[in-house]
Amino acid sequence: MSSSSPILLMFIFSIWMLISYSESTDYLVGDSENSWKFPLPTRHALTRWASNYQFIVGDTITFQYNNKTESVHEVEEEDYDRCGIRGEHVDHYDGNTMVVLKKTGIHHFISGKKRHCRLGLKLAVVVMVAPVLSSPPPPPSPPTPRSSTPIPHPPRRSLPSPPSPSPSPSPSPSPSPSPRSTPIPHPRKRSPASPSPSPSLSKSPSPSESPSLAPSPSDSVASLAPSSSPSDESPSPAPSPSSSGSKGGGAGHGFLEVSIAMMMFLIF
């Protein structure tokens, strides 16, 4: 496990360097060809140029110059300040020097000629660590569609139900006149006819005091015919004899009428 750790670290470092170099930028010193030369437009022209950019690990700066008159030396800060051209420096004389910035911090470059360095032909760049690649922000989610207002559908018209046929009032049967039953006369037992008392000759009896006489034959026939009410079925009483008939044989005439009435009753 311990032997694999250095390999893993080197692999991670290689990947990191590869990513850094893939995002590196190549800068031309002074933004023009043959800008590494003397005299400069101003003494601080290269310092002003470097302040316009932000350098990161993996970037490349290129020096273009005339290699017959100029050279490039990578020095420490002390030699940069005093323009010391002697020491352990990295010297370039090819006329098209490309320097890869491999570590963070301040990198110092001076001219191979001390006089030119003092007149401003020198450069210091600040190198920063490459920013960590952040995953791009997710694309904004599309706005949620607003819920469409439901279109109100017209209510379905219910078909009118056919009116239920109302039961037609059945014509009530008119009361038919019930046939009046003719009372069948039952024969009555023959009772001995008692002679009606003869009225007193001294005073004529009043209608309430005179005995009711048997009905006449015409009245008996009428009582047998159908009548409109039960009261009609009873035989009407015979008229009382007038006071004038009570004189001169009234008793015999009354007995005769009673006999005739009894005979008619038995016949019918």
From Swiss-Prot:
Q: Where is composition skewed (Pro residues) in this entry?
A: 134-145, 160-185
Which family is it part of? Answer: Belongs to the early nodulin-like (ENODL) family.
- Low complexity bias located where? 199-235
**Official protein name in the record:** Early nodulin-20
The record's GO molecular-function terms, alphabetically, read:
electron transfer activity
The residues forming a coiled coil are: none
Gene3D superfamilies from the entry? Cupredoxins - blue copper proteins
User: In which compartments does the protein localize?
Assistant: Cell membrane
GO cellular component: a single term:
plasma membrane
Which positions fall inside the Phytocyanin domain?
25-129
Q: What is its main location?
A: membrane
Which domain of life, per UniProt?
A: Eukaryota
Entry membrane topology: Lipid-anchor; GPI-anchor
Give the gene that encodes this protein: ENOD20
Q: Name the segments for region: Disordered.
A: 134-253
What are the lipidation residues for GPI-anchor amidated serine? Answer: 243
| Glycosylated residues in this chain | 67
- Pro-peptide residues, renumbered to this chain, are 244-268
**Which Cys-Cys disulphide bridges does the record give?**
83-117
Function of the molecule: May act as a carbohydrate transporter.
Q: Give the record's GO biological process terms.
A: nodulation
What keyword terms does UniProt attach to this protein? Cell membrane, Disulfide bond, Glycoprotein, GPI-anchor, Lipoprotein, Membrane, Nodulation, Signal
Q: Which residues form the signal peptide?
A: 1-24
